[in-house]
Amino acid sequence: MSRYDVVVYGASGFTGAYVVEYLVNSEQFEGLSFAVAGRSEKKLREVLRNISQKTGKDVSNAAVIVADSADERSLNEMARQANVVINAVGPYRLYGEAVVKAAVENGASHVDISGEPAWIEKMQQKYSKQAKEQGVYVVSACGWDSIPADLGVNFLKKNFHGDLNHVESFVQLLTGPSGYSFNAGTYQTLILGLSGAATDKLGAVRKEIMPEKIVRGAVKLPKRPTLWEIKEKELNGVAVPFPGADKSIINRSQYYDATSRQVRPIHMETYIRLSSQFYGYLIGLWIMFLSIFVKYPFTRRILQQYPDQCSFYMFKNSGPSARQMAEASFVYWFFGYGYKETLPLDQQHEGKINRKVLATCKGPDAGYIATSGCVLSAALTLIRDKDNLPKDGGVYTTAAAFGNSKIYDYLASFGITYQLESEYDL
């Protein structure tokens, strides 16, 4: 049986439909075959008709595969027809493992847009050996969470003249006059993640997938309060810790660098840049409110049933409008600190940090446009740039899998760009 280059699973969902639309519109995918997959053939056909109307490219007769995360046989049949499965069905802690299992067992690589560290790391624990034996790649967090951040640190390491010691990143989501609301599916994933945090046993998983002790630089990251003022000469504002998957993904990439590439690992911290302290306090209170109420079944059900009201309309069942997405964008700032001197990996620097570098990553709407561009770039890399991937299959982070590839060019074609802004001695 011949395989499609890409199968988009969950193509009738809110995010999945955008992934298919940007695939159809991308010149990078010309000459590649694709299919859409999901539970309802009717909904999938409707998505294809809508995309045909929006793009002016007739894909109404594109291949459709009916598959369901609760039906192992259908997932196996889907995976047997794919070179790469793009999995856009979340929450992944509920529906993701069956798709990974089917892909690995049937010789398909798998990328997804999960931002759920516990699930992501459990997939490495359970499937990395089998994926390596099959020669396929499983790469999670290939959406906006966490390609911009993980590949941003990788970009900084490659462009730092000397030995990089630590990085602080700041991300800001920019909205237009129409405002912005994320789709409620992201909110439901957040609720599940908070409620499952106590039982995830993530520490034990990490000891298994990262058994070796790696040595990072002697200079530690600055200790920051939960809410603090940014006072870089290139950036000001207020910062709070970033609650997403970026830090966990980057730390796994640093482990891979140290143990597999013999590249010096760095210390890392991730933050959100806010325009005011008042907004920071509101976000903090909301997260505290969620963290308390997810513990109790009754209040958790209320949170799940009323995402609009319980998130103060930051999340909506309807998701953002087309205008809101068109007006939205994001920017990452990566501040790197290190030494202009280069030492062997097993030697530590002495003395003060003496070099600083700033890089940025900019792109369109983070939630859906950039996420589509990121996961499609990951799929393209698996298809077109195999020579620059790790030699063996397995479960990898984005930087571990794609750090030496052409993915930066693919990302740029979707409007996601990296720039070295400055580098100077301290």
Curated annotation (Swiss-Prot):
<keyword id="KW-1133">Transmembrane helix</keyword>
<protein>
    <recommendedName>
        <fullName>Lipid droplet localized protein</fullName>
    </recommendedName>
</protein>
<dbReference type="GO" id="GO:0005811">
    <property type="term" value="C:lipid droplet"/>
</dbReference>
<keyword id="KW-0472">Membrane</keyword>
<keyword id="KW-0551">Lipid droplet</keyword>
<dbReference type="Pfam" id="PF03435">
    <property type="entry name" value="Sacchrp_dh_NADP"/>
</dbReference>
<dbReference type="GO" id="GO:0009247">
    <property type="term" value="P:glycolipid biosynthetic process"/>
</dbReference>
<dbReference type="InterPro" id="IPR036291">
    <property type="entry name" value="NAD(P)-bd_dom_sf"/>
</dbReference>
<comment type="similarity">
    <text>Belongs to the saccharopine dehydrogenase family.</text>
</comment>
<dbReference type="GO" id="GO:0016020">
    <property type="term" value="C:membrane"/>
</dbReference>
<dbReference type="InterPro" id="IPR051276">
    <property type="entry name" value="Saccharopine_DH-like_oxidrdct"/>
</dbReference>
<dbReference type="InterPro" id="IPR005097">
    <property type="entry name" value="Sacchrp_dh_NADP-bd"/>
</dbReference>
<keyword id="KW-0812">Transmembrane</keyword>
<feature type="transmembrane region" description="Helical">
    <location>
        <begin position="278"/>
        <end position="298"/>
    </location>
</feature>
